[in-house]
Structures are given as C-alpha cells and as structure tokens.
Amino acid sequence: MSPDLLGALLVAAGYLAGSIPFGVVLGRLVLGVDVRTVGSGNIGATNVARAGGKKMGVLVLVLDAAKAIVPILVARRVLAGTPHAEVWVTAVAVAAFVGHLFPVWLGFKGGKGVATGLGIFAVLAPWAALAGLVGYAVAYGLTRISSVGSLTGTTLCAAGGFATYGPRHPISWAGLAIALLIFLRHRENIRRLVRGEEKKV
C-alpha cells in the first residue's frame, strides 16, 4: 500500500474516531438523559457537567481529547519515515476535529471542539497546550464563565503553535484553522458575552 493511500485511510479513520459522541453515549448510559435536551444542548464536557456533575464532565473532556490523541499517535507510528508524514499526521488531527464538530453518527451536528482541539495540541504542540490550559484556568477563575476560559485557552494554543513551528509548518495553520472553527462554534456564546447574558458555571 502506498504511503499516500495509507495516509488517506488514516484520515478517514481519524474522522470516524472524532465522530464518536462520548457526551451523548455516556449521558444515555450513565445519566439516562440525552444531553442535547438539557442545559445548552451541547454534547461537550461543560454541558455534561451541568447534567451529571463535574466528574462526568471531566470524563467526557478526557475522552473527547483522546479521540484526537489516539488517531494522531497511530498515524505518527504507522507513517514514520514515509514521505509527507507530517502533513498526513496533521490531516488526521484536523479530520478528528472535524469529526467532533460534524459527527456522522449524529447527523453532522456535534460539539464545539474545545476538548478535541486540546487533545490535538497536547500531541502536536505540548507547550502550546500547556499555555492554553493555564489561560483557561486563569480566565475561568476570574470570570467563572466557561466560554471565556475556552476562547482564551484556544487563542493561546493557536499562538503557541505558531511560536513552536513558525508560519511555514502545516501544524501552525491547522492550529489556526482549529481555533477559528472553535470561535465560530462559540458565536452564540460570544453574542451573549457582548450582551452580558452569558451564564456562569
């Protein structure tokens, strides 16, 4: 099998892995509810925490990050030493992220991508991920508003990716695209923030 065909298959697998809606699955199996019908209606960790407590929220956060981490690590191992390996690995990361946002299992209606994006940065740019976590903690600690923490952390992750790899590397641009998509998925949160109506968690 050619490296490019293998890379394409790994991208498809990354998308399918990213599409696994852990928030919905655990909500139904453990909490007995469809998290899409409670709170904000989002399938991510914050809304799961609203429905089932902080431990459930943390579990979903870890699993949503892992569904990007695992495909990236597999792609790195399988494609090691092949031409364009870094490009394909980056493509697998983006595919997992897109899978979370537009999961085939849920009619392409998914989450906002913060945890999955964090998983991507944790593997591809660990220092950027650390900066993002610190930024989230500080912003959330000051405001008690999850979206403020998420958007602050996302911005620092993307900036950290550029600082790590420079403007010519595919990971830098993938990180920027991921950040922009996260901001787009938070557009309603941003509107509520502007109006002073965003709820604290």
UniProtKB/Swiss-Prot annotation:
EC number(s) given by UniProt: 2.3.1.275
GO molecular function, one term: acyl-phosphate glycerol-3-phosphate acyltransferase activity
Its membrane topology: Multi-pass membrane protein
Function: Catalyzes the transfer of an acyl group from acyl-phosphate (acyl-PO(4)) to glycerol-3-phosphate (G3P) to form lysophosphatidic acid (LPA). This enzyme utilizes acyl-phosphate as fatty acyl donor, but not acyl-CoA or acyl-ACP.
Family label: Belongs to the PlsY family.
Complexes and interactors: Probably interacts with PlsX.
Name of the protein in question: Glycerol-3-phosphate acyltransferase
Native source organism of the sequence: Anaeromyxobacter sp. (strain K)
Lineage: Bacteria, Pseudomonadati, Myxococcota, Myxococcia, Myxococcales
